[in-house]
Amino acid sequence: LQKMLFPTGDSVSELDALRKAYKEALASVDAARDAVSKAGEDQEKQKAAEEGVQRAETAASEAKEKLDEKRKAKRPDTEAIAAAMVRNSGDPDEDKRQREVADARLAACLAEHEDNPFTLPASGSMLGMLTERVACKDKLLACQLDAILHAEAFQELEAVWRGLHYLVFNTETSDRLKLRLFNASFKELRTDLERAVEFDQSLLFKRVYEEEYGTFGGEPYSCLLHVHEYGLSAVDLGVLQKMAEVAAAAHTPLLSAASPQLFGLGSFTDLPLPRDLHKIFQSADYIEWRSFREKDDSRYVTLCLPHLLMRLPYGNDTDPVETFVYEEDVAGPSPDRYLWGNAAFALAACITAAFAKYGWTAAIRGYEGGGAVENLNVYKYRQTNGETVALCPTEVSITDRREKELSDLGFIALIYRKNSDKAAFFSGQTVHKPPVYTSDTANANARISARLPYLLNASRFAHYVKANMRDKVGSFMTADNVSKYLNNWISQYVLLSDDAGDDIKARYPLREARVDVSEDPGNPGAYKCVIFLRPHFQLEELTASIRLVAELPPPAV
């Protein structure tokens, strides 16, 4: 095979020698030209140097011609080699003969397209050399693919679509549970909301409110998921405030995410560093943010954090690529090269799971209460000391103390369960900051109205009352008739027992309910309706204490 690939008898060493001679001739040309520049005004030296340049250029030209001739001579005729290999084989084994023909053709192809001289590998197999060449190309392709996958713009796009994939495949859609996708960039959404004179003149309001909640036969939305991370900029706060107005008008809670910049951080991996988060939010930079939290519409806004690992890095041991060998370069624990997504997708999946199981959406928090997020992507890598560690699939592990701080500040944190592939939402706090009253009852009502599980259920009652009473328009019903009708209807969702199990309470979300209907004095035939709802309270926190005594005291009354 070696002789057939080099029909002129030239060896690889001869071709290397010609290539080396050509490089030396080029170096001589450069040296001769330097001598001309150094000759100065001495005519004799300058003339001698110019003659040296001519000789060097001539020698270089001759060396190049010889090298080109040898290169052409070593390029074999592919078909001739293949035919010769088959004809001269003499081996009846068809597989072996075809192998020899394939080796010859591959060798000819490589010799024709590569500048380097062709040499057989130590094994003598041409397919082995081809494998080495393919591996080299795979490495080059992997570098290019790493640059694409780790580009910030591409990561944002991939994270959105993988988050949507996660939500769809973790939702039991049916005729009672539907997902709708509204494709619009943040810039388009901002333009729509800012150009509208009032929020109810925007296209978003028409899509969310008028076309469904405000239309006879429409299907009001239970909640909205906006795939964006809100920071502290004036643009983000302006859009968030207008989104809250739309959500409040349609009684449709808005789910979204908080950006690390909202906390003054570069990434959520730095979240454990600040000693006191409350102190950060009391600075002058957060004046507009604090003002937004005090508005009633902010109770319809929920911001989640930190992030979810949307996929494992590509690789043979994690997520193999079928078309070629690819090991994604993620550089250990550095978070920038991993694909992080919006945690609001996980909260939305908890909401749809609760509705599919119970028909209501109160059971969305707590590890055993419907807030568990399972089957997270856990990536394990080896450190320089040889120890195998797991990357936190929620980007950062949040302690109980920090989770309480975040909840008090109006955020819902996804808490990772150590040494597992599970996490859970324990808080149900919306962005709204409950006002403080002098009455304990008023303070309790304010805190309840700022929690997402209760708000989701209350919003659905508001949707039903409007849709159902719209059907009664034109009928001969008095205020007492309307009140009796609505109280009978709402009583079917009331469970008076406090000792019932969690599953029963999830199906009957109200502990008490009452509907008051009164006539509008200035508008005959029009009634005003006020609905009072008392949900089954969920465990928020538990303070435990231990006392060591020699004698047990009597139980406290």
Place the predicted regions along the sequence by residue:
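Generic, well-ordered alpha-helical scaffold segments in large soluble proteins
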Residues: L140, Q144, V160-L167, V246, ...
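N-terminal-proximal low-complexity accessory segments that begin disordered
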Residues: L1-G9, R75-K187, D192-E194
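Extended, regular secondary-structure scaffolds
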Residues: Y213-P393
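Extended amphipathic alpha-helical heptad-repeat regions
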Residues: P7-D77
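C-terminal edge-of-domain segments
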Residues: R514-V557
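Long, contiguous, structured domain-core segments that constitute the functional module of a protein
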Residues: V325-N481, Y485, E541-A544
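Short, hydrophobic/π-rich interface segment
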Residues: N481-A506
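Core mixed alpha/beta domains of very large multi-subunit molecular machines
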Residues: W161-R180, T191-F216, V235-V246
